[in-house]
Design a protein with these regions (language model features):
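A short, N-terminal "cap"/entry segment at the start of jelly-roll beta-barrel domains
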Residues: 1-37, 117-131
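Conserved short histidine dyad/triad with adjacent acidic residue
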Residues: 24-27, 38-55, 90
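Conserved strand-loop elements at the edges of beta-sheets that form or border functional pockets
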Residues: 30, 54, 62, 80-82, ...
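Short, conserved beta-strand element in jelly-roll/cupin
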Residues: 41-45, 54-70, 109-111
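Short beta-strand His + acidic residue motifs that chelate non-heme Fe in jelly-roll/DSBH
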Residues: 50-52, 70-71, 88, 93-100
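A short hydrophobic beta-strand segment most commonly corresponding to one strand
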Residues: 60, 87, 101-121
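Short acidic-glycine-tyrosine-enriched beta hairpin
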Residues: 74-91
Length: 131
């Protein structure tokens, strides 16, 4: 048994290569091999968002606070609120973040395949974000 104590891991700033705007990442769990699943609480300030990306085994988001937006490639921008759960299928190109005026926090859960949980791509343009 391993108990991950709240606040035991340091918060981190979302790197500019992967995010637009101010993003804080609070790791929640990342068990050792052979386990593959990891989770983090991710907080986006208004206007902040991920770059386009995919996950080899998919991703689940559980919205905790605020108002956010998500989009899969070729689809409309969708609004997400506390209590909403979003599933992105393996390989589905997408982004997620806060709305333009309201911060948003979600728990992100994904699995690693070959030691990798995400493939980062280009940034979401302001035009794409505001659609």
């Amino acid at each position: 048994m391993d108990i991950q104590r709240s606040g035991a891991q340091s918060s981190g700033k979302g790197p500019a290569e992967w995010f637009t705007g101010t993003v804080r990442i609070d790791p929640l769990f990342s068990p050792p091999d052979p386990a593959r699943v990891a989770g983090a609480l991710v907080t986006f300030e208004p206007g902040a968002r991920t770059a386009w990306h995919t996950h080899p085994l998919g991703q689940t988001l559980i919205v905790m606070t605020g108002l956010g937006w998500v989009q899969r490639e070729g689809g409309p921008v969708e609004e997400i609120r506390p209590g909403d759960v979003v599933w992105f299928a393996p390989g589905e190109k997408h982004w997620h973040g806060a709305s333009a005026a309201t911060a948003m926090s979600h728990i992100a859960i994904q699995e690693k395949l070959g030691g990798k949980a995400v493939d980062w791509m280009e940034h979401v343009s302001d035009e794409q974000y505001r659609r």
